[in-house]
């Protein structure tokens, strides 16, 4: 590329960033994420690294979508638990009226400190969300789910009435109002969304998310979460192998994919996730079926090695620290909760 063209493109990039903000455009091959982006860990180290900043960014809108029972709420609750560990406040707007408090507690959420709202209408849910964000004291706000944000007119109307585009209009208006105050308050707002099928699509992906197109534009990070296999112990299904694709990312290069295990009643397997990453980065050696770390054997087979690590949290923390060092991402600490 000639010097003049290089100069011209640099000028265009700087103008785009000036007008639309840092991260509006970036080179796909560039490894660097946006500098100094405060983030909250997701509970999965591999996903934290795929997001490029060590977790979901603060002061941004995040969308987590996928089919039913794919782990959307589990991932959102893990993020809420991580925010609480850092000394922050988490809120959960339960529009689906389906939050399982016992399960949230098992994932590490301090349920006594969790702010929970079960609104009657979509308008009420989004107004509550706006007031919580405006307070400036909430670190993570989860809205579960966009599909359950039913407009008041639809609730008060008859069962067969048509309400075309009402929910999309509601979301569009709410996001226009919310996006500015979310940025100022440094709150991470997570919208959980469901998948629908577009009718009559012959070519391309027939899947779409509910609530119109506004959320697709306003979200800084969009995560597509899918169950790809069942985890079995004998004949019993004890969990699922889950794949997450970073479909959109305005704080680091997108399109990265990760896989991790979600166990029923336990959530994301931290030890299994760290073990997979450590093998990938060459921190843990895998020879045949044996896993070894620092010359010592951890176990034979992945499951035995995972259970060995589960009983030794200090060893897990040590390996996790080395993974962060190799990845070149600073470890997220309590200092960021302020």
Swiss-Prot record:
Gene3D superfamilies: P-loop containing nucleotide triphosphate hydrolases
Family according to the record: Belongs to the RecA family.
Protein name from the UniProt record: Protein RecA
Gene from which the chain derives: recA
NCBIfam families per record: tigrfam_recA
Gene Ontology BP, a term: SOS response
Natural source organism: Geobacter sulfurreducens (strain ATCC 51573 / DSM 12127 / PCA)
GO molecular function: ATP binding; ATP hydrolysis activity; ATP-dependent DNA damage sensor activity; damaged DNA binding; single-stranded DNA binding
Key words of the record: ATP-binding, Cytoplasm, DNA damage, DNA recombination, DNA repair, DNA-binding, Nucleotide-binding, SOS response
InterPro entries on file: AAA+_ATPase, DNA_recomb/repair_RecA, DNA_recomb/repair_RecA_CS, P-loop_NTPase, RecA-like_C, RecA-like_N, RecA_ATP-bd, RecA_C_sf
UniProt-listed PROSITE patterns: RECA_1, RECA_2, RECA_3
Subcellular location: Cytoplasm
Residues the entry annotates as binding ATP: 66-73
Keyword DNA damage recorded: yes
């Amino acid at each position: 590329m000639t010097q003049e063209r290089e100069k011209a493109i640099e000028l265009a990039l700087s103008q785009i960033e000036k007008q639309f903000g840092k991260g509006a455009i970036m080179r796909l091959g560039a490894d660097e994420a946006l500098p100094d982006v405060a983030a909250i860990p997701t509970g999965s180290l591999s996903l934290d690294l795929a997001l490029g900043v060590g977790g979901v960014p603060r002061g941004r809108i995040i969308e987590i979508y996928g089919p039913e029972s794919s782990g959307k709420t589990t991932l959102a609750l893990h993020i809420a638990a991580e925010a609480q560990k850092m000394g922050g406040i988490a809120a959960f707007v339960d529009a689906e009226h389906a939050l399982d408090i016992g399960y949230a507690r098992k994932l590490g959420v301090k349920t006594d400190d969790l702010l929970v709202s079960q609104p009657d209408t979509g308008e009420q849910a989004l107004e509550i969300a706006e007031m919580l964000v405006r307070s400036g004291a909430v670190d993570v706000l989860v809205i579960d789910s966009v599909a359950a944000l039913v407009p008041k007119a639809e609730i008060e109307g008859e069962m067969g009435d048509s309400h075309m585009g009402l929910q999309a209009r509601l979301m569009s208006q709410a996001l226009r109002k919310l996006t500015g105050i979310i940025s100022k308050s440094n709150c991470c707002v997570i919208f959980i969304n469901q998948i629908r099928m577009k009718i009559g699509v012959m070519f391309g992906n027939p899947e779409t998310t509910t609530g119109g197109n506004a959320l697709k534009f306003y979200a800084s990070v969009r995560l597509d979460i899918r169950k790809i296999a069942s985890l079995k112990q004998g004949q019993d299904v004890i969990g699922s192998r889950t794949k997450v694709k970073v479909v959109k990312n305005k704080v680091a290069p997108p399109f990265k994919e990760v896989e991790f295990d979600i166990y029923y009643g336990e959530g994301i397997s931290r030890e299994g996730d760290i073990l997979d990453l450590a093998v990938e980065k060459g921190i843990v050696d895998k020879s045949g079926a044996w896993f070894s770390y620092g010359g010592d054997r951890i176990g034979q087979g992945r499951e035995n090695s995972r259970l060995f690590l589960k009983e030794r949290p200090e060893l897990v923390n040590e390996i996790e620290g080395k993974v962060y060092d190799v990845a070149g991402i600073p470890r997220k600490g309590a200092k960021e909760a302020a």
